[in-house]
Amino acid sequence: MIGIFDSGVGGMTVAQAVEQALPEQRLIYFGDLARTPYGSKSPETITNYARQNTQFLIDQGAKLIIIACNTAASIASDTLHREFDLPIFEVITPAVAKAVATTKSGRVGVIGTRATINSNIYEEKICALATRAKVFSQPCPLLVPLVEEGWLDKRETKMILRRYLSPL
């Protein structure tokens, strides 16, 4: 069984992609709606949440974990790899590979929670793959609550996104 966790429902897109790619595999998804958003919490708290989520999924029978939360992956991935003896994947590495492969100018914009941006994980991984890349990072603390509330197509969300993306 594959266990997938996120701080909310955004990781359902990851679960859907895994289900399409591996239809014979059983999945369990844990969206931590009780403690979302993670992005404004301390690294210690985020790591503890990720540890608890991973253990919960293992207790349910998961033999492989996917961290579908950028914030948890950026802060706790190394700890989870050290502490748990099973395959653990995260969403950052494939996103970085796609960004590096897609950019024509060598410029890559990254948006995320404060914790994700402050971890510098995207910049480190992008520059490891493309040493001449220029990375422009922008924290977007209001984005997670808007997405979780289903406000993707609202005028207010578009205004906030324009504001966040203008420096990029």
What are these regions (language model features)?
Residues 1-168:
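Non-catalytic structural scaffold of enzyme domains
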